């Protein structure tokens, strides 16, 4: 790789930063962002979206890998062949927000619920998929999407869904999932 970036997050970050529903930021939020970088562009994914493929293919031309060195404090190292003459632009943070999520910051629990709705064929992350499948585009602010998301939130609560369990199960227990989904439900109500 032509560039390596190591990001050291502050000790105590998980206690100091909370989501809108009071849930604490966790390493799982970062890992979910890593997963989502890849999953929507994979043809065998339940949330595959061909609109995600071009950006993903471009990303793969320079991406070489990443490694979580530590979860507390969080330290993430990334290798890439893409680099800029201004070093501060070479940092890969995996902060759970744009560009991975095209609508701002989001915790793993919110993305999990939206993924369930997308896998269920009721919502789509992109306008392209929404149009081609004749379904609503995911909207976390208003519209019919909220009713669909509420339904899948109830499902996630009932199932204590740990999304991408083989990977995120290393960072989330069923009890963690129940707490996060419960906080989201209370905030939404």
Predicted regions and their residues:
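Aromatic- and charge-enriched surface segment that lines or borders ligand/interaction sites
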Residues: 1-46, 78
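Surface-exposed binding/hinge segments that line
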Residues: 8, 47-188
């Amino acid at each position: 790789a032509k560039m390596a970036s190591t990001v050291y997050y502050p000790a105590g970050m998980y206690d100091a930063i909370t989501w809108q529903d009071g849930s604490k930021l966790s390493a799982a939020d970062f890992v979910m962002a890593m997963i989502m970088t890849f999953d929507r562009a994979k043809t065998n994914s339940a949330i595959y979206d061909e609109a995600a493929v071009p950006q993903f293919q471009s990303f793969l031309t320079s991406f070489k890998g990443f490694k979580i060195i530590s979860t507390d404090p969080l330290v993430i190292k990334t290798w890439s062949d893409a680099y800029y003459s201004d070093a501060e632009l070479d940092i890969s943070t995996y902060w759970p927000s744009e560009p991975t999520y095209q609508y701002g910051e989001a915790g793993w629990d919110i993305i999990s619920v939206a993924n369930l709705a997308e896998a269920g064929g009721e919502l789509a992350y992109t306008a392209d998929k929404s149009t081609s499948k004749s379904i609503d585009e995911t909207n976390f602010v208003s519209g019919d999407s909220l009713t669909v998301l509420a339904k899948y939130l109830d499902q996630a609560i009932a199932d204590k869904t740990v999304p991408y369990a083989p990977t995120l199960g290393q960072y989330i227990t069923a009890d963690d999932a129940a707490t996060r989904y419960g906080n989201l439900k209370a905030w939404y109500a």
